[in-house]
């Protein structure tokens, strides 16, 4: 008898009567199609709504479908005082935050902010100028 596994570890790698194979996610045509559909759905959700799912470097962050004209997505370092700086820039510009979420993963964080009105280029530039901000994107 032989033990077959696709999850190698030091214990089974050198064991007698053991066959260790690479783990092949999406190893059938059907699973490849399902993975492709999932990737397209998640990319579309990111582009249209700013939501992130299954990212390697960023946390899952989902505020649902964007129902406002002023959603802003901010990729930034996961450091103290970022949220208050975003709120200060927006408040100083007279922008009201109607909804917001912030999620972090390791060294990076992601903030989605729904505004009652779209942010103009001047506000976006001020957000981009905050130390630790990597990217600001107007979703809608």
Please state what every model-predicted region is.
Residues 53-140:
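A conserved regulatory-domain signal marking ACT and ACT-like small-molecule sensing domains
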Residues 1-63, 110, 114, 140:
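Rossmann-like dinucleotide-binding domain for NAD(H)/NADP(H)
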């Amino acid at each position: 008898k032989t033990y077959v596994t696709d999850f190698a570890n030091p214990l089974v790698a050198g064991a007698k009567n053991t066959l260790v194979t690479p783990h092949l996610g999406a190893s059938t045509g059907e699973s490849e199609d399902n993975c492709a559909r999932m990737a397209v759905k998640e990319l579309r959700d990111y582009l249209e709504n700013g939501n992130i799912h299954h990212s390697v470097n960023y946390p899952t962050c989902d505020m649902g479908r964007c129902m406002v004209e002023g959603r802003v997505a901010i990729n930034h370092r996961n450091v103290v005082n970022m949220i208050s700086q975003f709120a200060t820039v927006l408040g100083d510009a007279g922008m009201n935050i109607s909804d917001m979420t912030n999620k972090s993963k390791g060294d990076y964080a992601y903030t989605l902010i729904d505004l009652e009105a779209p942010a103009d280029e001047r506000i976006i530039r001020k957000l981009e100028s905050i130390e630790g901000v990597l990217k600001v994107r107007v979703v809608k």
